[in-house]
Amino acid sequence: DHRDLHLSLRRQRQMCIRDRLTSLQGLAKKLVEVPKGFQLQRQVKKIYDDRLKMANEEIPVDWGFAESLAYASVLSSGNTVRITGQDVGRGTFSHRHAIVYDNKTGEAHIPLQNFQGDKSFSIYDSLLSEAAVLAFEYGYSTTTPNALVIWEAQFGDFANSAQVVIDQFIASGEHKWQRLCGLTLLLPHGYEGQGPEHSSARLERFLQLSAEHNIQVCLPTSSAQVFHMLRKQVLCPLRKPLIVMSPKSLLRHKKTVSTLEEMAEGSFQVVLDDPKQSDPSIIKKIIICSGKVFYDLSAERDNRNLSDVIIIRLEQLYPFPHEALESVMAKYANAKSVTWCQEEPMNQGAWYSTQHNLRRAMQSNFGGLELRYAGREASAAAAAGYPALHLSQQEKFINEALN
């Protein structure tokens, strides 16, 4: 009887996933439709052609299309979506293309307005005052609880021009006035040699502001993760601001892609175990990290052919996922060292505000071990100004993490 019930439940789940997959494919195909005779610019046409292949499951889904699919899915469930920022129609790094233009006439076309009518999806390339736009979007999102309201910084670094809005309203508004707000901030963040003004969304500031479950701080590292995260933000009945350290180079990284099936099933995972995990009993070193640095560590580990090193990703830093992290770490009980690795300098990033949480997660299985740090040395500026210095710093801390 138990076996029959188990089989029946499994069949139901498979049918449910199949239905969701069919629905997603329908949304995906609708996203690449353009009016008859509409002439796309050459590179944009290539992106849309690739997206049609993604819709047909010929190639995996990249970040830009996963994000668009999340919006389409939210719209088809009857919610509205609103996006503002200095270059959001195209996306600062040319990944979104939510607005496309006819190469001959200059006419604009917005595929996401085909889902629930043009009133349900709004996207505006806004003026260059971060404080003004973010303040307006905060007010808008507090009064429109069923909308997915997003403000995207051109680079995460520029959010500091709106620090007053973040401190006075977004982080503390619920505590001061019991005003709930579901605003989402997409802040491109990542150390890629572009210097101190184009590397850091100042993750440490958001973590310092975190208390009483006031905000969520996430660093998604795959297409499926960003899809589930954005859907969860509006479909979950709890309204909290969502701060996302969004990617730059990862937008086109071959390892960040996901299948449509991964989007049709599952949910946002606050902790990701290593996809390359082998026999857990042979693991001697655990590295815990967040964001892009996972792919830098993973590439170097493969390069050195290290089979006894595991890399665990924290996709959410606040609220801290204690139980999820402890349960993943428990599998590697034979490990002899635990390291936190970050690409930010020691006085920045997650180290200062997260190390006590990491030590707590170690207590049950690794109480006798000391938590190690691997990352850049403390710095007054967010990042090095010279690409060569950036690379030498990265090689040094990746080496420290893996040795």
Roles of regions detected by a PLM:
Residues 1-13, 17:
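Single conserved hydrophobic/aromatic residue that forms the stacking wall/gate
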Residues 18-146, 151-174, 260-312:
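Non-catalytic terminal/interface segments that mediate subunit docking, oligomerization
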Residues 29-36, 76, 170-175, 208-212, ...:
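Generic secondary-structure signature for well-ordered alpha-helical cores
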Residues 84-85, 184-188, 220, 243-247, ...:
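Short beta-strand segments
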Residues 88-90, 153-157, 187-192, 223-224, ...:
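Acidic, glycine-rich active-site loops and adjacent beta-strand->loop/helix elements
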Residues 123-128, 153-160, 193-201, 214-221, ...:
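Alpha-helix capping and helix-loop boundary segments enriched in small/acidic/polar residues
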Residues 141-148, 183, 188-236:
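Conserved thiamine diphosphate
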Residues 177-179, 190-206, 236-239, 251-403:
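Thiamine diphosphate
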